[in-house]
Amino acid sequence: MEDMTVEVRGSNGAFYKGFVKDVHEDSLTVVFENNWQPERQVPFDEVRMPPLPDIKKEITEGDEVEVYSRANDQEPCGWWLAKVRMMKGEFYVIEYAACDATYNEIVTFERLRPVNQNKTVTKNSFFKCTVDVPEDLRESCSNENVHKEFKKAVGACRVYFHAETNQLIILSACESTVKRVNILSDMHLRSIRTKLMLMSRNEEATKHLECTKQLASAFHEEFIVREDLMGLAIGTHGSNIQQARKVPGITAIELDEDSGTFRIYGESAEAVKKARSYLEFVEDFIQVPRNLVGKVIGKNGKVIQEIVDKSGVVRVRIEGDNETKLPREDGMVPFVFVGTKENIGNVQVLLEYHIAYLKEVEQLRMERLQIDEQLRQIGMGFRPSSSRGTEKEKGYATDESTASSVRGSRSYSGRGRGRRGPNYTSGYGTNSELSNPSETESERKEELSDWSLAGEDERESRQQRDSRRRPGGRGRSGSAGRGRGGSRGGKSSISSVLKDPDSNPYSLLDNTESDQTADTDASESHHNTNRRRRSRRRRTDEDSSLMDGMTESDNASVNENGLDDSEQKPQRRNRSRRRRFRGQAEDRQPVTVADYISRAESQSRQRNLPKETLAKGKKEKVKDVIEEHGPSEKVINGPRASSADKASNPQTASTERNQASCQDGSKQEAIMNGVS
């Protein structure tokens, strides 16, 4: 403000020092030194510029000078006009010209100066410029020290901010200042803004330094977050940091972005830990068994998505087999989770529980499979279907152990049409004494081995025929049904004729056609039958049994027609095949009434035989039974064939036996048990 110093003439004629604050059309706003007078506007003709400071002081006696003095103690000093009367050394005797009465005073050389030759100021003595200040810079522009460099650059006398007009005022005594202001005003405002920002940062740094000094003795924690997780820790627009700062008791949170270090300061350890839980993001992995990966993920990722939602983790990733970043155990697949430490702990609990649950379910499933396997193995013991092929290959050589194992604990004695009870008397006159336990056991062996060796289709057709011939149900000893131990209707069977020779033999011819029709129809229905019921098929009267074969011919196996009985009725193993071709055999050998009459006479002769003959016949019958179940089979009146040959080609063997029996019966007469 010294550059705008002026001298204002007072009422007493002295000039007092003042400062120009503003320039008007015809006056100046002047502020006096030390404010001994209030600020006021002074006309141009009462204001002059001070003399230059480098003027040489050459004062001699009689020169007019100006003395820096005051009239009284209440007024400040001013320049008064005077005249030098005498000088002695450094002291001068002056006489004031302003006063009417002469007033002399002795002064030193420092209080004297030559008379100021400057005239009063005019309108063109000062130049004024104004610059509009933005709102954000008004506060900073109020400080005159901010414009120090600008003032020096433009050559202004004074630069200050006017609060009423919000303008920056530049005052100068040079006209060139106006041009410079127009050039530098924008740059000056921009520099003010930059300096303001820097100053604000410095102030924050100063405050932070003070806070750091205060918090040095308080609670604080420091942790590092990985660079790739820094974005998650900061959050969207710094949401996580703001949330952590809102925790009660948190005083400051610092972040070093270069190293990824967070520093949290708080009033208590609990507040610091809570704020840390919001900011500390980590990555961790959990090993999952490979066989449970699919179940952990779930269909369309439903299970793993539920785990992620409940735990709060940010993301999950399954480590591939080709990736080797994480340590991997044998048979395990790493699941990588990203989130806060609390979220990682939650997902670990959920995943471990789910894996334990899956293992328990798998263990229960394996136990169920073991139980099912044991049940399947136990069930196979009652089903000899798996050994069916081997039994077919064995033929008639099935031993007693095999038969008993197939038969199991089930007893077949006394059941079925072909089974004879202990009190059964054959129609051929054989009483119960002839059927001993050995014969019954042999009969069981033969039936089981023959039945297991028969084909599936033969069993079904045989079962169908049996079911077709049971119109009366399964009552016990019923006359019209198939009861246990009962016959199949005595009027239509050969056994009924043999039992009662005196009856009408022509009644059999009436029922032959219906019997054949029943056999034919039975093969076309009832295909779905039970395996066990098939294995216990009841023997029909047409099926020859061991006991029937022994009692029908006590003397020999040759009937009255000259045919070998053992070859006319081959082994029961080929029973189904024999029935299949029975129509052809019946065409070759039709049944006549004479056959039944001759058979009845033979039966009557057998009843009249002596006891010795019967005993001899009994021994021969036992011998035949042993030969039939032995390794080699001996045919008395027919061609010899092994069991394997019969099993391999039963159809051919049956046909050959029928032909051979016809030839042998016509050429020679066999003798057995002494009876021709």
UniProtKB/Swiss-Prot annotation:
SMART domains: KH. PROSITE patterns: AGENET_LIKE (PS51641), KH_TYPE_1 (PS50084). SUPFAM superfamilies: Eukaryotic type KH-domain (KH-domain type I). One of its GO terms (molecular function) is mRNA 3'-UTR AU-rich region binding. Residues 423-439, 645-665 have a biased composition (Polar residues). Residues 528-538, 571-582 have a biased composition (Basic residues). Residues 512-522 have a biased composition (Acidic residues). It holds the Pfam family Tudor_FRX1. Residues 380-676 are annotated as: Disordered. One of its GO terms (biological process) is somite development. Residues 222-251, 285-314 form the KH domain. GO terms for cellular component: cytoplasm; cytoplasmic stress granule; intracellular membraneless organelle; neuron projection; nucleus; presynapse. Residues 4-50, 63-115 form the Agenet-like domain. Residues 353-379 are annotated as: CC2 domain. Residues 404-414 have a biased composition (Low complexity). Keywords: Cytoplasm, Developmental protein, Differentiation, Myogenesis, Repeat, RNA-binding. Residues 609-632 have a biased composition (Basic and acidic residues). It is found in: Cytoplasm, Cytoplasmic ribonucleoprotein granule; Cytoplasm, Stress granule; Cytoplasm. PANTHER family: FRAGILE X MENTAL RETARDATION SYNDROME-RELATED PROTEIN (PTHR10603), RNA-BINDING PROTEIN FXR1 (PTHR10603:SF6). mRNA-binding protein that acts as a regulator of mRNAs translation and/or stability, and which is required for various processes, such as neurogenesis and muscle development. Specifically binds to AU-rich elements (AREs) in the 3'-UTR of target mRNAs. Promotes formation of some phase-separated membraneless compartment by undergoing liquid-liquid phase separation upon binding to AREs-containing mRNAs, leading to assemble mRNAs into cytoplasmic ribonucleoprotein granules that concentrate mRNAs with associated regulatory factors. Belongs to the FMR1 family. Disordered region at the C-terminus undergoes liquid-liquid phase separation (LLPS) for the formation of a membraneless compartment that stores mRNAs. CC1 and CC2 domains are required for homodimerization and FXR1-network nucleation. CC domains also mediate interaction with other proteins containing similar CC domains. This is RNA-binding protein fxr1-A. It comes from Xenopus laevis (African clawed frog).
